[in-house]
Regions:
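Macromolecular interaction modules
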Residues: 1-194
Length: 194
């Protein structure tokens, strides 16, 4: 499973209520007419991510797809047909944005994460050792490990999503970001939230 992760933030003069309403309308339109391979979407609001709004208030959308082919279909579908007007209405009030591509490496999707831990692989550590060390820590909180693909995106290489605080990540010097559910899985297609 892949996730297109899109960070975005509102224009100063736009109210949070209006901005989130437009975003919800787009997610709903995408869910009502999903492209092939689209598994669902969710979004959280956050602060302190240096790659989003300079660390200010921002949103982080997760668009889940089966594979790279489905990612291409999502790219086309997001701005066409019944999704075009809601997409454009949401985009016109955004002050900026950045995107990244992540693959689910371990665990299951956490549809309503409360905590995100962003980090890079420690120097000298092999990937197999990193995954072996992360697995029991992440399993304990029923979390998910996402790994950036093809160095696409401004954020760090790994993200651990969890519904509860995660201990045992000190070695990774993770940037810990508290999350707030901005809108639930409006575009869900059979994936149960954790």
């Amino acid at each position: 499973m892949l996730a297109y992760v899109f960070w975005h933030w509102k224009q100063v003069e736009i109210t949070t209520k209006d901005y989130e309403s437009r975003q919800r309308a787009f997610h709903a339109a995408l869910g009502a007419a999903p492209p092939s391979g689209f598994l669902g979407s969710f979004s959280v609001s956050l602060s302190y991510a240096p790659w989003a709004a300079g660390g200010g208030d921002a949103y982080e959308d997760w668009y889940l797809v089966q594979d790279f082919s489905a990612l291409g279909l999502l790219n086309e579908a997001a701005v066409s047909a019944s999704r075009a007007a809601p997409h454009d209405a949401a985009a016109v009030v955004a002050a900026g944005g950045a995107g990244g591509l992540y693959r689910l490496q371990h665990g299951a999707v956490v549809r309503q994460p409360q905590h995100a831990y962003w980090f890079g692989k420690p120097e000298g550590m092999q990937y197999r050792d990193l995954f072996a060390q992360l697995a029991p820590v992440v399993d304990q909180v029923q979390g998910a490990v996402w790994m950036r693909q093809m160095v696409l995106g401004p954020a760090r290489e790994f993200c651990v999503h969890a519904g509860a605080p995660v201990s045992g990540l000190a070695e990774f010097n993770a940037l810990v970001i508290p999350l707030r559910q901005a809108w639930p899985a409006l575009a869900s297609k059979g994936m149960e939230p954790r």
